[in-house]
Amino acid sequence: MVGFIYAGQGSQRVGMGKDFYEEYPLFAKTYDNAPSYVKEYCFDGPAETLGQTRYTQPCMVAFAVGVTNLLKEEGIVPDYACGLSLGEYSALYTAGVFTEEEVIDLVAFRGAAMEEAVVGRTAKMAAVLMMDRETIEACCKEAQENVGDGLIVSVANYNCPGQIVISGDEKAVDEAVKLLQEKGARKVIPLAVSGPFHTSLMKPAGDKLAKKFEEINFGEPSVKVVYNKTATEIQDGETIQGLLEQQVQSSVYLEDSIRYMISKGVDTFIEIGPGKSVSKFVKKIDKDVKVMSIDSVADYKQVVSALKGGCNE
């Protein structure tokens, strides 16, 4: 069985999609129909502008949509799909929940809402390497108590064994890092992001998204989607809207999501980039599964050659 996994914010790079745009009219159509800045910032940057959340998100999703459309034209569709944070929206596009126009518009709105949620607040995210979940969670809780003043730090991403990301107010994150180092954390890497994503500080963005969702007719998923917040498929009583509203302000359980997909029989993962960071996480979770990534036309041709006829049609 095949699972598509979609990259999240941070994987963007100047030049992404240019080779696809020049070779495949179907891909070019996606970029041409997107807001004009998508093509401009994807192809020419500058990297600082492409890295602004309100622009990163529609640019990343336009790339993912374009590649997904090419795969679909080849008859390659997944049995399961999931995405890292922003990538969840691309997974839902793959499943037919959103149209191309809807998903690019929606993530542009999401990116702006996430930026606006923390205006005037100094935030930070950091990747903690080679430390167990329980210790990291305990240090975050202790750090919050130590700094007080309503400052927040919590786990944002459970990426893979040995890599967990914490997020929140800068002072609280710095305190958590100090506590983690005292507990023996080998390495803590600050991340170049523009907000305390996947914490309760993103509640204003979640509230705005909830209102925005009222304007959209959510389609019935044609592919099984595994959600960031729950690391499973949708359950009775849950809605996609509710899960997405919570996702922006809750921990992302990527490792658990990948393990769930493997437990359901997925043995081949295709990362739709740009970048190859999620593929590395998958290999750390289970070295026996097959993992391929699509960052370039050369990658795409290799994946099609390997999979043609091997997926659902």
Q: Over which residues does each language-model region extend?
A:
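Non-catalytic positions within long, well-ordered alpha-helices that form the structural scaffold/packing
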Residues: 72, 181, 262-263
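FabD-like malonyl-/acyl-CoA
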Residues: 1-136, 268-300
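Short, flexible loop segments at boundaries between secondary-structure elements
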Residues: 230, 290-311
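Alpha/beta catalytic cores of group-transfer enzymes, especially the acyltransferase/condensing modules
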Residues: 11, 36-39, 96-249
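A short, acidic, amphipathic alpha-helical segment used as a generic capping/interface helix at domain edges
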Residues: 249-266
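Glycine-rich phosphate/pyrophosphate-binding beta-alpha loops
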Residues: 56-58, 196, 251
